[in-house]
From Swiss-Prot:
One of its GO terms (biological process) is U5 snRNA 3'-end processing. Its EC number is 3.1.-.-. This is RNA exonuclease 3. It is found in: Cytoplasm; Nucleus. One of its GO terms (molecular function) is nucleic acid binding. InterPro entries: Exonuclease_RNaseT/DNA_pol3, REX1-like_exo, REXO1/3/4-like, RNaseH-like_sf, RNaseH_sf. Pfam families: RNase_T. Gene3D superfamilies: Ribonuclease H-like superfamily/Ribonuclease H. Belongs to the REXO1/REXO3 family.
Length: 404
């Protein structure tokens, strides 16, 4: 059995990892029996088993309901000979699995660039959806509000202490938890995965298991972001029609939150077209290396933001005809200071509730691929996001040759 077959980590776990793991193995074996007549590989079935199990886990309110729902699934997978459209969980048709079945025993239906472009354009998000999800859209230029950007004080993004922005380079003590707290259904409290402390703990560590000698902040409004550098519009750049997957790494500076690495990958060839560490405009406060993977920036050899902008905002890379793919792409476009309206965002495409699935979990759920096990890598993340979209429209992640 494949080493990739493990349950997807969830914010709210209906059951412990070991029990979910055992049930997932049983589901995989049932799928092997149900699809024995197809040409699907074990990897295909592992991916399907993972998707089905996490779907049930997310739609089960307790460990007991999870076990019951999984017993129904284990029974009906064989009963209906793998036809998932006939299976109901909690009285509802099993959603979320059927679109992925094309990879089992069938050839790719999309073999030309024109067909792929047609499918991709159908995934482009409406401007209202973009604005609702935190994207800075071009229309915001005409309704600016300087109230936030002129504030002298800001809450520290890590410890929530209010501090004076102009004092950001002065040393102080910031105590915080580097990882977001997770709700535990069994204990009914929140736990910090970085250290195991809980919100109802009386230990001093509940205040934070890590310290830093500066507070940090992150401006998010159009006005605040423009204090660092103005936005550019891709509408002003004509060029080739292309599809690009991108990801940025960011760091905290004296001006807020800035891009320090950018990777751009071509959708059709899988080739990396741009991958550079970039000098931020402000003075570096924290490179956030545990997450960004960037440990130093050579102020002599690394391109400045302006130099990088002149390269990636061009007729052969990002232009008005480009379709941009990313996960939580509003964060990337905001630090790149770009207005762009042809966007495919996997965080929005795969959101099932008000909470968005992480790229780490999405890559494992859809691709059975482990990413972000340590420091983040913008190249790895850009490729994973691109491959998730390929699977979404029925293309193999390894496909890089196309018929005319």
């Amino acid at each position: 059995m494949g080493s990739l077959l493990r349950p997807v980590d969830l914010v709210n776990q209906p059951l412990g990892f070991q029990e979910r793991y055992k049930i997932l193995q049983k589901l995989f074996k049932q799928l092997q029996k149900a699809y024995a007549h197809t040409k699907g590989t074990n990897i295909d079935l592992e991916r399907l088993a993972t998707r089905l199990e996490v779907h049930v886990a997310k739609n089960s309110l307790s460990g007991q309901s999870y076990k019951f729902n999984m017993s129904i699934l284990l029974r009906d997978v064989l009963k209906y000979k793998g036809d998932l459209s006939k299976i109901k969980i909690n009285g509802r048709p099993l959603k979320g699995a059927k679109p992925h079945l094309s990879s089992i025993g069938n050839a790719n239906s999309i073999t030309t660039k024109s067909k792929a472009m047609e499918a991709l354009k159908a995934l482009i998000l409406d401007s209202k959806v973009l604005e609702k999800n935190g994207y800075i859209v071009k229309e915001m230029q005409n309704k600016t509000n300087d109230d936030n950007s002129t504030q002298l004080y800001a809450p520290c993004l890590r410890c929530s202490s209010n501090f004076k922005k102009t004092d950001i380079m002065e040393k102080t003590l910031c105590r915080y938890h580097p990882l977001k707290r997770i709700y535990n259904r069994d204990t009914k409290n929140h736990q910090y995965p970085c250290c195991g402390e809980t919100t109802d703990s009386v230990s001093f560590l509940r205040l934070g298991c890590k310290t830093f000698f500066h507070h940090v902040f992150r401006g998010e409004s159009y006005d605040e972001l423009c204090k660092i550098s103005k936005f550019s519009s891709t509408d002003d750049i004509d060029g080739v029609e292309n599809v690009l997957s991108l990801d940025c790494e960011m760091a905290f500076t004296s001006l807020g939150y800035e891009m320090i690495r950018l990777t751009i990958v071509d959708f059709f060839t899988g080739k990396t077209l741009f991958d550079h560490v970039i000098q931020p405009i402000g003075d570096i406060v924290d490179l956030n290396s545990d997450f960004s993977g960037v440990h130093e920036i050579d102020r002599t050899n690394c391109p400045t933001y302006k130099e990088a902008l002149d390269v990636f905002l061009s007729e052969n890379l990002i232009n008005k005809n480009s379709i941009l793919i990313g996960h939580g792409l509003e964060n990337d476009l905001n630090v790149m200071r770009l207005f762009h309206n042809k966007v495919i965002d996997t965080a929005i495409l795969y959101s099932r509730t008000k909470f968005k699935v992480s790229l780490k979990n999405l890559a494992f759920e859809v691709l059975s691929r482990k990413i972000q096990n340590g420091e983040h890598d913008s190249s790895q993340d850009a490729i994973a996001t691109m491959d998730v979209v390929k699977v979404k429209i029925g293309i193999s992640p390894s496909q890089n040759k196309w018929e005319k």
